[in-house]
Amino acid sequence: MGKTTAAAFLLLAAAASAATGGDIPKAVVVVESLTATLPGQVPEAAPPRFVLLEDGQVFVGGTSRLAAGRLAKAEAKDIEARVVGVRQLPGFGPSVTLGPGPQRHLLRLRKGGAQDITVEGDPAQATTLPALASLLQQLLRFDHPSLRPYHPGSYAVIAREGKLAGGCRRWTFAEAVSESLFAPRSVPAADAENWPTGAAPASVCAGDKTYVVALRPLLPGERP
């Protein structure tokens, strides 16, 4: 691997790590997708697939947008109990494979001790850890009558040097795009009204360089 290629790889890895490294305040459990739904997407910029907070507030995300709602105390406690049960499974650790399939998810458990688990395979085709597969399926498909569209107050800028097919757009935010190369910076939602958000990236021209930029929605109290 040449020095230029190695540097680019480390740059992208650092940005991805920073994008998924922050904690959501008061979270009980968070599920994030680590695989792109479509070619060219930036999976680390997609909103979390599922978030449950200690007060029963819940967020459900897709490729770019989120819905927010609130669970009854009994509903939240049921999910918490299932999480406790999963923690006690034999073979449960930092990385598990459920079975076949290219899917990769990050399960972030926060209540009762922080623990991040990379889960590989399609939970619908699980051959091991059925309780974990069942929980993951429930959270990935989660629906609730209280859910309403969530409008974030800010976004995290995830950027890397590169090009996309077609033209590029002018950078319109106050802080230079290069400031987000090693660690995402936040921008107000009001300034991002005409930008694609979530996993769908934009091509940006700034000076003599071009960047691939994605805006990840931030939850209340979350920092990039």
What are these regions (language model features)?
Residues A45, K73-A76, A126:
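Amphipathic, non-membrane alpha-helical segments in soluble helical-bundle scaffolds
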Residues M1-A7:
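Bacterial N-terminal signal peptides that target proteins for export
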Residues L10-T20:
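Hydrophobic h-region of N-terminal signal peptides that target proteins for export
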Residues F59-G91:
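A short-motif feature that recognizes glycine-rich, charge-decorated loops
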Residues P48-F50, A67-G69, G113-V119:
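Short beta-strand segments
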Residues E54-D55, K73-A76, L109-Q115:
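A short, structured loop/turn motif at beta-sheet edges
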Residues A19-L38, V42, G91-P224:
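Short, well-ordered, aromatic-rich surface patches in folded extracellular/luminal domains
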Residues V42-T63, S178-A183, V187:
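Short, flexible N-terminal segments of the mature chain
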